[in-house]
């Protein structure tokens, strides 16, 4: 690595910008259909609310705003996600530059995020709220480290923005600023930064950002937390010791799943020279160690006293995203030479930057050879186009939010309701005809689903209409494989 490049790391951000633009292009080329989180964003962008359910509303608010400016489209979805990811990597790189002297290690730390499967693959595949958590964590972490090293009014404000956004992204984000606070208080050299009057600005900014949602949360706490708690505590009828064992083992597996590949890659590219780093440290490595320790203790307490039995790897994003930076800080503290390792590392990154988009596209396109179909293979748009030739729907009732979001993408001017989300119930009086659409399971009944029939009776006083079937070829179909949808038309009473 030349001395010029060591002084100038802007090439990292140019490389990342090109990579995320490539990801936008790949997503648009893969399929017009939407996956679960994408469809949720499109469906819920029909209205603006202080809260929507088990997930806090940050991403919904952001996507709603963008759709208001650009219209509903897959391009708007993909650009928002990849722009958030790019900004997150940018802030991560700026944070690394604050506390690492070796610019090669700054590059390795920043691009090292691409070695974490949950960050590089899962976030692109479908996740939205986890992307918002990473974005918020990157803002907070930059503001936090800058407040410790180069304190200013702006740095404390940035930290407050990160906390506010993070709590609006996922509730478990609260563990990150708590861990950071405890970790900094444990170091006498950093303690004055915590007892700084400017910390009041951090708290006030965070509170202002989350205040609208807090008022909603006060009246909807059960609605907002029930689903998450159900996922976390799904241990069946296991005894307390068995539940704790399940929780601890799931946490261990989640940590290995999250960090294993990154640790393996660093071990390979640095080889034996990595060994001295294991026993080396600095003020910054000690800070990050305490943060990660507090975070993990917090989760263990949730397992032991909160009944959590299933910890998912993506829930570790608010804390373990600092892993590449932590390893690089250890390497620098040991005085390890980085020139050869950097060249090897860039080969790995090149493989990842080419391989991940190819894998994302291939997981859908390979269906023409394997006959294994993903949600993105489903032909929602051709189905709706055919049904609109029969009649132009004035409103649509979908069997679930996945279907509702996919339908709304192609008919944004028409209200689309979902049986599984009663929170959105616009006035349908005078809107006719009403189109009902549902997914047909393979070899399942073709009749109108009971919950849709009940919805019609309760909301419209309408009897069960004739159920019909339409099938369309899968995207990237093998042979004559087709996907079936059930549908029905209802002429509503005036």
Give, region by region, the residue ranges found by the protein language model.
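Transmembrane-lumen/periplasm boundary regions of multi-pass, lipid-linked membrane glycan transferases
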Residues: 177-283, 295
């Amino acid at each position: 690595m030349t001395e010029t490049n060591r002084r100038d790391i802007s090439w990292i951000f140019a490389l990342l910008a090109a990579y995320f633009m490539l990801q936008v292009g790949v997503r648009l080329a893969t399929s017009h259909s939407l996956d679960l989180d994408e469809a949720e964003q499109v469906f819920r962008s029909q209205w603006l609310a202080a809260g929507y359910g088990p997930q806090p509303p940050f991403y919904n608010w952001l996507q709603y705003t963008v759709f208001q400016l650009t219209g509903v489209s897959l391009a708007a979805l993909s650009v928002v996600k990849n722009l958030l990811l790019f900004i997150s990597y940018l802030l991560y790189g700026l944070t690394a530059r604050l506390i690492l002297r070796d610019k090669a290690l700054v590059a390795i730390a920043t691009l090292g995020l691409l070695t974490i499967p949950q960050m590089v693959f899962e976030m692109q595949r479908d996740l939205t709220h986890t992307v918002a958590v990473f974005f918020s964590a990157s803002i907070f972490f930059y503001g936090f480290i800058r407040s410790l090293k180069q304190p200013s009014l702006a740095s404390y404000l940035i930290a407050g923005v990160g906390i506010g956004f993070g709590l609006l992204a996922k509730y478990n984000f609260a563990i990150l600023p708590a861990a950071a606070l405890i970790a900094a208080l444990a170091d006498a050299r950093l303690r004055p930064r915590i007892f700084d009057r400017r910390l009041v600005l951090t708290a006030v900014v965070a509170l202002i950002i989350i205040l609208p949602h807090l008022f909603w949360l006060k009246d909807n706490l059960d609605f907002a937390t029930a689903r998450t708690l159900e996922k976390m505590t799904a241990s069946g009828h296991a005894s307390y010791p068995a539940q704790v064992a399940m929780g601890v083992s799931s946490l261990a597996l989640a940590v290995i799943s999250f960090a294993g590949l990154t640790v393996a890659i660093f071990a390979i590219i640095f080889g034996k020279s990595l060994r001295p780093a294991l026993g080396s440290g600095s003020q910054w490595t000690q800070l990050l160690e305490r943060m990660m320790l507090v975070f993990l203790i917090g989760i263990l307490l949730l397992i032991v006293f909160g009944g959590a039995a299933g910890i998912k790897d993506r829930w570790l994003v608010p804390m373990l995203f600092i892993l590449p930076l932590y390893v690089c800080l250890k390497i620098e503290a040991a005085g390890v030479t980085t020139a050869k390792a950097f060249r090897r590392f860039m080969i790995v990154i090149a493989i990842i930057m080419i391989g991940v988009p190819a894998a994302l596209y291939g997981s859908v396109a390979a269906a023409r050879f394997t006959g294994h179909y993903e949600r993105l293979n489903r032909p929602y748009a051709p189905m709706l186009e055919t049904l609109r030739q029969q009649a132009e729907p004035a409103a649509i009732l979908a069997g679930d939010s996945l279907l509702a979001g996919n339908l709304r993408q192609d008919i944004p001017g028409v209200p689309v309701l979902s049986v599984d989300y009663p929170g959105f119930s616009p006035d349908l009086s005078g809107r006719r005809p009403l189109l009902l659409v549902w997914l047909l399971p393979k070899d399942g009944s073709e009749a109108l689903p009971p919950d849709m029939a009940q919805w019609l009776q309760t909301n419209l006083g309408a009897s069960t209409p004739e159920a019909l079937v339409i099938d369309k070829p899968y995207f990237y179909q093998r042979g004559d494989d087709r996907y079936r949808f059930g549908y029905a038309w209802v002429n509503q009473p005036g």
